[in-house]
A protein has these predicted regions:
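Structured, active/binding-site neighborhoods that engage oxygen-rich ligands
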Residues: 1-294
């Protein structure tokens, strides 16, 4: 989720005053977190602490009513009267990264992404934007390859839709434009930093495109440690606490997956004889003697 936050912070000062300079200063004194970060933290908090997505978004957005760049007009009304309003805005995609990072199968990622969107952005395109973004993050995280992004683009979007993405510098705040654009920008990237620079210097809704691309880039490349440290200096303590809890959860999940892999039985086939035997988890693969438990 910190990838989305970094993209948001880097793009914040250019949202209404675009830059096309690739070499812009990433962490400038004029930068700050925007509504994209507040909503991303809210989704993470909901997952980590068993809250509903609606209640967590309402809680965090009321707590931070005036972030840099402000909330959209319809979403402001939603904060104080949380009834879905059929939006297809890119807010559904910019806040969904915790879903793609925390859940571990496609079905759950799809379902939870839809749930995060439906509370406000209940238009089919809003839901689709959230699902596509979360699925891309999930597959980038698990496969560490660009191929899933290419497959997602061809599966969810027609050629006509892909040729209709926003031009450089064109304002676009809907999912059907911003999400495929973000996926394409990632495909052109070579590193986390390069992805952020490409996103922000493309212009348009620079903080939100930065947030979406940042969330994708985090899943594929990881984040440089100095970027993490700099980004955290812009955030209040309660947001840092959620991020810390999120990172600890990711670490625990990763270690658990490693443990399960070590403890799993698996089959080994002899290439000469073609015979297959099962290696038990409690067995040393090298000398095939039982491992003594301490």
């Amino acid at each position: 989720m910190l990838g989305a936050i970094i993209g948001d912070i880097a793009g914040s000062r250019f949202e209404f005053r675009n830059t096309f300079d690739y070499d812009f200063e990433l962490f400038h004194k004029e930068c700050d977190y925007t509504d994209d970060t507040v909503c991303t933290v809210a989704i993470a908090d909901a997952i980590l602490n068993g809250k509903s997505y609606e209640s967590s978004l309402v809680e965090w957005c009321r707590k931070y009513p005036n972030p840099m760049g402000a909330y959209g007009g319809s979403f402001v009304r939603w904060i104080y009267n949380p009834v879905p309003y059929g939006s297809w805005g890119n807010g559904a995609a910019m806040r969904v990264s915790p879903v793609g990072l925390l859940f571990n199968n496609e079905e759950t990622v799809r379902r939870e992404a839809e749930r995060t969107a439906k509370v406000s952005h209940s238009h089919p395109e809003g839901i689709k934007g959230a699902q596509v973004t979360a699925l891309a993050i999930f597959y980038l995280r698990t496969m560490k390859s660009m191929k899933p992004v290419e497959n997602i683009l061809s599966t969810f979007y027609t050629k006509e839709e892909l040729t209709a993405i926003p031009e450089k510098g064109e304002w676009c705040d809907n999912c059907q434009g911003c999400v495929p654009l973000s996926l394409m920008l990632l495909l052109q990237s070579t590193s986390f930093e390069d992805a952020i620079r490409r996103a922000v210097s493309y212009g348009g809704d620079s903080d939100t495109v930065g947030a979406i691309v940042g969330s994708l880039a985090e899943a594929l490349y990881g984040i440089p440690e100095d970027f993490k440290e700099k980004a955290l200096t812009y955030l209040p303590n309660d947001m840092k606490e959620v991020i810390h809890m999120f990172n600890q959860t990711i670490f625990t999940m990763t270690e658990e997956r490693k443990r399960r892999f070590r403890e799993a039985d698996f089959a080994v086939t002899n290439p000469k004889t073609g015979k297959t035997r099962v290696i038990k988890a409690s067995q040393d693969i090298t000398n095939r003697k039982p491992i003594k438990k301490k």
